[in-house]
From Swiss-Prot:
Ranges that cross the membrane: 30-50, 61-81, 107-127, 134-154, 167-187, 209-231, 255-275, 294-314, 344-364, 365-385, 401-421
Inducing or repressing factors: Repressed by MntR in the presence of manganese.
Molecular functions per Gene Ontology: cadmium ion transmembrane transporter activity; manganese ion transmembrane transporter activity; metal ion binding; symporter activity
Compartment list: Cell membrane
Similarity remark: Belongs to the NRAMP family.
Gene Ontology CC: plasma membrane
Bilayer topology: Multi-pass membrane protein
One Pfam family this sequence matches: Nramp
Broad class of the protein's primary localization: membrane
Gene this chain is encoded by: mntH
Record's protein name: Divalent metal cation transporter MntH
Task performed by this protein: H(+)-stimulated, divalent metal cation uptake system. Involved in manganese uptake. Can probably also transport cadmium, cobalt, copper and zinc, but not iron. May be the predominant transporter of manganese during logarithmic phase growth.
Keywords linked to the UniProt accession: Cell membrane, Ion transport, Manganese, Membrane, Symport, Transmembrane, Transmembrane helix, Transport
GO biological-process terms attached to the record: iron ion transmembrane transport; manganese ion transport
Length: 425
């Protein structure tokens, strides 16, 4: 239960108050506020990102690295708005929407939110199951059941409190970091080409624009927007406007660090694909093919690192999806079901799809299409609410933030419409 657990993890601890009072500074002052952004950041390294980044790197080399950098900057702003909403109001995004919108609108938003969670779970479970299949040769159906059991184990951390969950998720994020850092080291990318790809925007034909749209469009995940506002709403509660502003400054640093890590992981996926596949004239779209090629071009260790990264990213992001679903139901319709019941219900569609024998990469693409539908329903209300002084008080967006946010929203929604049309063309 999201709110209850967050509250339980938000005592007026001496460390928090000393940091707000300025008695402790630097990293010691920041430490009590670290955590929420690391949970939200898991959404940015889900298996859908694996497929998109590897396709981009294998087909166009380092050329589209700048798109990942730009996407990360956009995500940084959007996640900061979500966190700020929770800090300013003490409510999550769906709760504010329920108060501000008519009941039929809230019910409609809840339904589309649940569809987003199902699509999210599909992507995460396929990624985790594929990781098990690639690493151990376990058939996909059995692997998906093992992945389901693993996701229940991760949720058990939440019963011990949100600090335990934050530590567990951060640990899993660290595993993915190590896996792709080693992969990048083994791939021996060209440093000059990496820097050019990061800072010199370029395209090469229509297909490169389409892949760039895929990277941008898949960057902002709707469930991460809902969840981040819940992670900050009662974790540390400011008594005054000044304290709330300080809390947001600390949380912004938390977001900056977490998104930097997530961005580095996404960039490393593309870099490794460019250094190995593009260099050897291989266009790789399927994750199982990528795994085999890592083993062939580098070593079995490189292939294993890829499989481990995919498995851990899938497991951790599936648990984050479950937490987001709890926020969506509680916020939009003020109703809850036990977290483990929700987990059980949401694993059924992915397991059925895997059992049907659908190609994993095809299923990942279709899940991203469903997620594309949900972005506007999370992003537009978020910008509306954080630009409203009645709701936000002194933490209202600066005018330039509002303008930039709307431009980003228009860009992301337009790109996702474009991707949906292209998928079914």
């Amino acid at each position: 239960m999201m709110n209850k657990d967050i509250t339980a993890q938000s005592p007026r601890s001496k460390a928090v108050q000393d940091a707000l009072d300025g008695k402790i500074r630097g990293f010691r002052g920041l430490l009590p506020f670290l955590g929420p952004a690391f949970i939200a950041a898991i959404a940015y390294i889900d298996p859908g990102n694996f497929a998109t980044n590897i396709s981009a790197g294998s087909k166009y080399g380092y050329m589209l690295l700048w798109v990942i950098l730009f996407s990360n900057i956009m995500a940084l702003l959007i996640q900061s708005l979500s966190a700020k909403l929770g800090i300013a109001t003490g409510k999550n995004l769906p709760e504010v929407a329920r108060e501000e919108f008519p009941k039929p609108v809230s019910i409609g938003l809840w339904i589309q939110g649940e569809l987003v969670i199902i699509a999210t779970d599909l992507a995460e479970f396929i990624g985790a199951a594929l990781g098990l299949y690639l690493l151990f040769g376990i058939p996909m159906l059995e692997a998906s059941i093992i992945a389901a059991i693993g996701s229940f184990a991760i949720l058990e951390l939440q019963r011990r409190g949100y600090r335990s969950l934050e530590a567990g998720i951060a640990g899993m994020l660290f595993v993915v970091v190590i896996a792709f850092a080693l992969q990048t080291f083994f791939a021996k990318p060209d440093a000059v080409s990496v820097m050019k790809g990061l800072f010199v925007p370029a395209f090469h034909g229509t297909d490169s624009v389409l892949l760039a749209a895929g990277i941008l469009g898949a960057t902002v995940m709707p469930h991460a927007i809902y969840l981040h506002s819940a992670l900050t709403q009662r974790r540390v509660v400011g008594k005054t406007d000044a304290e709330r502003k300080k809390i947001f400054r600390f949380e912004f640093i938390d977001i900056l660090i977490a998104m930097l890590i997530a961005g580095a992981i996404n960039a490393s996926m593309l870099i490794v694909a460019a250094a190995l596949f593009f260099k050897n004239g291989l266009f790789v779209e399927d994750l199982d093919v990528a795994f085999q090629q890592f083993g062939h071009l580098v070593s079995p260790m490189s292939a294993a690192l890829f499989g481990i990264g995919l498995l851990v990213a899938g497991l951790s992001s599936s648990s984050v999806g479950t937490l987001s679903g709890d926020v969506i139901m509680q916020g939009f319709i003020n109703y809850r079901i036990p977290l483990y019941v929700r987990r059980f219900i949401t694993i059924i569609p992915p397991i059925l799809i895997i059992a049907s024998g659908v190609n994993p990469t095809t299923a990942l693409v279709l899940s991203q299409v469903v997620l594309s539908f949900g972005i506007a329903f999370a992003l537009i209300p978020l910008i509306m609410f954080t630009s409203n002084k009645r709701i936000m008080g002194s933490l209202i967006n600066a005018k330039w933030i509002t303008v930039v946010s709307w431009l980003i929203a228009v860009l992301i929604v337009a790109l996702n419409v474009f991707l949906i049309v292209d998928t079914f063309r």
